Amino acid sequence: MHFVFTGTESTFKSTIAKKIAMHFNLLYIPEFARTYLEEISPNTQINPIARKDYNLIEEGQLALLSSQGYFDSNQPKVFDTDGTVLHIWKTDKFDDIDYKLLNIPSHIIYFLCYPNVEGAYDPLRMDLERRDVLHEQYVNVLKELPNTTIHLNQETLEERLRFATTEIERLLNDSI
């Protein structure tokens, strides 16, 4: 099984994913969009993002998922995003519904991070004021998938991390 942390911007996803990976000594696979925007193409305009840049991010994220064993259930791993984020982003920004992005393996366990925490400014964030609306899209997409979704709606990073750790311990113990 693999653990995917998903949800809107500024909900502690990346921080929790990294800490969980360290705690359980699991491979952490980062979000490609941030790598693209910070390292590969740092001068990219993000609001609005050009379709060509989105396409490069989608291509990079899908290649990263594939190369890091997302579709292979061996060895648990922690992913900081997957095709669900791309599906929601593509639908929201370009009105392009791409169900291929929702071809999710059955061994994926989702941790949906809620936007009930204060959003922190980051120059790469573009939808802080729309987190509640976008969160509903995540809820709806994840409801349609057969995968398990664990909701992280605690009000602090520490509480979310504690809850996620407990849930992952339970899942890992149940799989033995």
Please give the residue ranges for each predicted region:
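The conserved Walker
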Residues: 9
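Conserved glycine(s) of the Walker
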Residues: 12
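Conserved Walker
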Residues: 15
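Conserved substrate/cofactor phosphate-moiety recognition/catalytic segment
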Residues: 18, 22-64
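Glycine-rich phosphate-binding loop used to anchor ATP phosphates in small-molecule kinases
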Residues: 58-105
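A glycine- and Lys/Arg-enriched "phosphate-lid" helix/loop adjacent to the NTP-binding pocket
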Residues: 94-159, 172
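C-terminal accessory "lid"/substrate-recognition subdomains
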Residues: 151, 165-176
